[in-house]
């Protein structure tokens, strides 16, 4: 593969050239000059050696040696003196380009710069005499050539005119005078000075008139004009208005008012023109100039277009390549308008061909590299406002020299196993020199016959002996050679193989000039011409057409060049394409052409017509447009016709716009019934109207300035699980009532509230509890608020009451007689999405009574379902209002809803359906079917497969894979692998061999993360003979891109011993045997110590026990308050798990000596992995623990330990730091050491449960870490042997003992120490730091034997020995795990 911007592929003995910098420091820019002046076009380039600079004008090199007016400056710039420019001779104006060349290296070209020369001054408009009122605005025109505008200035009375905030010159040259004064009166003229003699315009007199009380019409003196500006320039939108009173100018952009005072880039110039500084793309749009003088408002608009010069998003990169390879120079540009791109090689334009192709819009692809392709390639982008260039260098590498090792011979039996029109498949056998060929790769070199440019295609993996060559030309001869490579290099090439691709079948090309046009609302005519490449006689054509938005395509056979399709839908868009047929079959299809049938009058009436009586003189009419299939065109309006019901001949008609779906009809008579109907309009005419719908205005206008009064009555009828509530409206009928609010609940009416329509007179409260006392309240409400409530109570019937017939409802005197007309279904059903499980359904009912005060017993049934799965059943609910809240829906699911009205025993049909899709929700189920398998041939790589969650609740946008070797670890300690949402499999590489891993997967969507899957265990396979490696290599692989998450930030590579990179590997068997021997020695030592301790404690005297029990804590928190002589002294060897060290009550020495104890560190230092041991292990960590330490220990145990370690390197580094201060026991008096306990102070703020014990340190450099507080009691806490450094096991009884440290203490001081897993007891147990215990000191042991007496009863001793036996079983389990 080609190398980009980096070091090239290196081979032994190969010398590789480096990229040579060659670039422009300064490039020429567009310049404007005048006749006779001098101009400099800057250019400077850098390279080593210095480049040679030349110039091109209009694509042709300039001969500067013999040119008197043009010369090359030392830095490479072009100097032109005495610019020549006339009507028939313009030798200096044009496009210039700087060319930099380095011999034997390459050439680059600069951007193109335009040199424009201002022409002779010509006035297109001149100032004219005018008058202006004091305080008003006026203009004086002076328009010249666009390139001469910068050279225009004005004079007043033959004196230079000074410009200020009140008098400005616009970019066009026009002079604007605002807020005119008498001093502005005079003669004005404009002058153009462009290098030659100045040119004067005609003089015009400006008269200033005094203010007048007459009204002067408001007019624009100058309107804004559309313009195009380049980003970063300034734009001035002119706008000057005049009138009496004087107008005020304001500006708007896209209907938003512009704030010209606070904006830093917007300014209002004299007269009202708008100036925009430093134009950006966001400034583009339509601007409105609005002039207002209080009597009249006028406006004018202009479009501002902002253009952006080309800018590179991605520039070409330098490339190393070898001959026959394919390369791609990438180039990505942006600009407005979109720039065009061309490529230049060493200053010459690259012409696209078979081997130089433009791919992916702007990239240059070079196929089959040859030595002459080497050089500099430049991407040149250009649009209307500028151009830019960026380049890169291509270096063709020499083939690597042959090595001394054996090279493969030529591949055998090279054949073309498959030959098609545009591809050839080659196969071969392995070389005779390497019959297996598993590690050989192959390169296929091929070229078109007669062409020197050769290309290469490599096999995808070692051992593969076939390749398919794509993108060939039909009926073309190609020459193929195959070459094998091994680790020493490329071998011999096979004999050339000559293969010719198959010729393509001669099929017709696309039919040109296909056109389609509508001839009527239901027909379209399509025409086309004969294909240019017919390849024989055209037999017939097939015309395909399809309605836009559908996927069903229809076709018809045609023998001519045109066809008219009838029976199409009105005002519907169709797409058409044509395929020509000859004797070989169908040819190439044409591009689709789209056309819409003509519009027609609507074929259906508007939908869901409803009437709302607003007051005594107005009615609001509502409707919905006809269905889209019946509109037959763009709805341009609606025609509303209405009349009094008593006089059918008197019809009033009004027309509204097509976007309006309601209309207020005013000026009606009081208490009068009116009929209404609506029809839709298109440009073709009026469609059918709806049926007449009636409504009656109120007799009088009702008051809504206050809340309604209390309802006149409230009645309740209790049933078993429901209560029927009925009421009558307030007595005062002159106050508007919008509805009623019913509150109810057991013992209180505020538990739930239901609102019903103002026309309703009863309601059934459902889903109540039997035999329960409910309090019910009723309030009328309107837009002002709720009125005074009316209270009632009722007790629902018990379950045993089977009388469910409600005679009160059946014989209700207020139930009206059913309307003999059939029930009409509800209309205007709409679904409003509220949340992920709630949708509100609303509708209208056209079958309500004509007047507003009559009520009946009708209710509505809402049904809904989803179509996934297809056999889902409908769900139903009843409602007595015109809306219903559907809850309990599934997230991200499309539902359909319909409504039916029921009154008495009659029901309507179901309404038209409405659809609504609930919002998304986070996944509520984890990914399922999680499986883990090992990748074949790669034991360190596994493949995780899964299926999406069953309850995704939305589109899955991604997954997160968690994995760890400790299933109980906190989730933030697991390693994560993100996966995109469309993937259901993922590879994880560089895992540790023969190690159990646990995997969890979590899905996410746009709302968040879902739950995790259950942990799936997978043990990586053991390494076979080919995969085995030294221990240091296995460990080192994690640091080279591996994914071992548990090493943590404290990991340090091995530095010495057997774990060093150069050490010999240690087999797992030797390591395990060494561990067993060490632990066994530790167990034997413990047994000996325990026997001695038991013997000593049996001789402890009663007097000595009382003396030890008298030890109190410093804060006086000792909880054993009995007589000291009743306290049995603790035997630390037996009561190990129930005692703790007591704090110092009083120190006999007022100035205890404190010493710093440095801790040497070697490979025996071991850090505990986790603090998740069970409770009895927690108790055994501290030999002295009583009731005082339970709280602190529980807090300590809850803290998180260090992250678990997956691998077990041992560290033999020298000490890194000193340990905290500890009291020295060597300098304390003997009496204090016998009667006092020591309180340990933790500098890290740890609890008092972290106690350390120490014994005398040996002088040997191999001593274990000793950071201990020596307890006054002569007995030591239990300790477990530690793992010694690599090498033969050594047991030194003189080594100091190290008790089991608490998790918190170890976390503070042993940061960089590595751990080794000891084993488990059938459950998760962390590795424990272990050391070899030492026997008690001789003096202490002698004192203990002298003071002790036998005081334990046989049964007590039996219990203690049983407990000791439990400890020994735990130790045995550790050694065998």
Curated annotation (Swiss-Prot):
Residues 410-504, 510-600, 605-700, 710-800, 825-924, 926-1023 form the Fibronectin type-III domain. It is found in: Cell membrane. PROSITE patterns: FN3, IG_LIKE. The chain crosses the membrane at residues 1075-1095. Keywords: Cell adhesion, Cell membrane, Disulfide bond, Glycoprotein, Immunoglobulin domain, Membrane, Phosphoprotein, Repeat, Signal, Transmembrane, Transmembrane helix. CDD domains: FN3, Ig, IgI_1_Neogenin_like, IgI_4_Neogenin_like. It holds the Pfam family fn3. Residues 3-1074 are extracellular. Disulfide bonds join 43-98, 142-190, 239-289, 331-379. Residues 21-114, 121-206, 198-305, 310-395 form the Ig-like C2-type domain. SMART domains: FN3, IG, IGc2. Residues 1010-1066, 1143-1281 are annotated as: Disordered. Glycans are attached at residues 42, 179, 295, 439, 458, 608, 684, 878. Multi-functional cell surface receptor regulating cell adhesion in many diverse developmental processes, including neural tube and mammary gland formation, myogenesis and angiogenesis. Receptor for members of the BMP, netrin, and repulsive guidance molecule (RGM) families. Netrin-Neogenin interactions result in a chemoattractive axon guidance response and cell-cell adhesion, the interaction between NEO1/Neogenin and RGMa and RGMb induces a chemorepulsive response. Interacts with MYO10. Interacts with RGMA and RGMB. Interacts with BMP2, BMP4, BMP6, and BMP7. Belongs to the immunoglobulin superfamily. DCC family. The Fibronectin repeats 5 and 6 mediate interaction with RGM family molecules. This is Neogenin. It comes from Rattus norvegicus. The lineage of its organism: Eukaryota, Metazoa, Chordata, Craniata, Vertebrata.
